[in-house]
């Protein structure tokens, strides 16, 4: 598993660094052509063009000064996980300039040395609270995400 974990770490670092610098095309190139990126805030994006647009039109439209540090990357060549510490400065109305930090776990399915599916688990409420959103806005977002989780269980 050592060399497979090292290969995965190189791949996910290439993806995360491309995202941090706003290079959507380079991030999307880490995926198979019909790969999926499931973002904890923005939802699911399928295909390289959708992933490129997500990076450029969502991530970098709503935030700046990204930092994404990875640790404990493990892979068997098909399934992979990595812990991360992620931060950014918000551009969203009402939270402009707020630095947001959270940690989480990346869950990755691999195919032919590329990402077939990227997903993540982190505490979205912690991130929203750092942006000083009103409690009602945070509760509304968390209720929506909870309903999505419940629906996915069926």
Give names to the regions the model predicted:
Residues 1-33, 138-154:
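Short, low-complexity N-terminal intrinsically disordered segments enriched in polar/charged residues
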Residues 5, 24-78:
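A solvent-exposed, acidic/Ser-Thr-rich amphipathic alpha-helical stretch
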Residues 31, 86-88, 122:
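Short beta-strand segments enriched in hydrophobic/aromatic residues
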Residues 36, 81, 116-117:
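General beta-strand recognition
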Residues 66-68, 100-106:
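Short, surface-exposed coil-to-beta transition loops
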Residues 103-140:
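Short beta-strand edge/turn micro-motifs at domain boundaries
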């Amino acid at each position: 598993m050592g060399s497979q974990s090292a290969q995965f770490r190189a791949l996910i670092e290439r993806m995360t660094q491309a995202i941090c610098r706003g290079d959507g095309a380079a991030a999307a190139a880490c995926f198979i052509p019909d790969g999926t990126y499931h973002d904890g805030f923005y939802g699911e994006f399928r295909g390289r063009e959708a992933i490129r647009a997500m990076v450029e039109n969502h991530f970098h439209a709503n935030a700046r000064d990204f930092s994404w540090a990875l640790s404990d990357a493990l892979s068997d060549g098909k399934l992979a996980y990595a812990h991360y510490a992620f931060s950014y400065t918000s551009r969203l109305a009402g939270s402009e300039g707020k630095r947001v930090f959270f940690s989480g776990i990346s869950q990755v399915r691999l195919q032919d040395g590329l990402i077939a599916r990227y997903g993540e688990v982190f505490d979205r409420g912690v991130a929203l609270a750092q942006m000083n959103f009103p409690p009602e806005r945070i509760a509304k977002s968390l209720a929506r995400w909870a309903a999505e989780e419940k629906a996915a269980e069926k």
